[in-house]
Amino acid sequence: MKTKGVSKVFKSGPGGSSLRPRIVEAARALFLSRGFIRVTADDIAAELGISKATLYREFTSKEEILKAVVRSLMAEIAGHVDAIIKKEDQSIVERLVALFAFLGGRLSLLGPVFLRDIQKSAPAIWREIEDFRRDKLLINFKIILAAGHKQRLFRGDIDDDLLMRMFIRLVEGFINPTEMLRSGRSPAETFESVIKVFFQGLLTDRGRQDFSSLTPALFEPRKEGAS
């Protein structure tokens, strides 16, 4: 699924109103700090100093506001990820380290409560998030694998299609609100664990050395005799 409609998130309301992007910005801050369920339309209107009637002239429901917020977040994430991946003046190691740092920080910002609320209260929007995540993973993981193999940083004895499916299953199985709330781990900790487990098995000795020079906590070179 492409991020269809994302570019239309801030389309002006009736009469070319500039209020719509302000509503999305205010709602985003409230949703991220309190979760979706605990924020009311009255809260959003009060944050902006407008009436609820004015709010509903721009959006028909709180769910429609949520959709706009989610699509703005997806567009922002997609833009950052694409920019990192396309930095051909940097090595794939440098790009991956930057990508891990960005995604870990973004997961911490979103938090499991906000994501759980979407999963429970807005399943159609949650499916859109899952489709977006899966598609971006597939597209960018192919680029990463190709570059890593070319530089002999990744092992060549494992089928790439299998690797991609394994990585997607890991992400979907552990980087989801239900699992993060159950485990008590922060989103960043969960993401770091998934990355460590997966890439430690994928990297060649050379790849592990290159990564460890930039991310020693994640990719320490194996010591002699270590299991």
Which residues are covered by each model-predicted region?
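C-terminal peripheral helix-coil segments that are non-catalytic and often amphipathic
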Residues: 1-10, 139, 143-151, 181-227
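Basic, helix-initiating cap at the start of DNA-binding domains
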Residues: 1-34, 38-50, 63-67, 72
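Hydrophobic/aromatic residues within well-ordered alpha-helical segments
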Residues: 19, 62, 69, 73, ...
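Short hydrophobic/aromatic patch on the recognition helix
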Residues: 49-59
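Hydrophobic alpha-helical connector segments
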Residues: 68, 82-113, 164-167
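All-alpha amphipathic helical-bundle segments outside canonical DNA-binding/catalytic cores
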Residues: 93-94, 132-133, 150-166, 184-193
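Short secondary-structure transition hinges
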Residues: 104-143, 150-153, 158-162
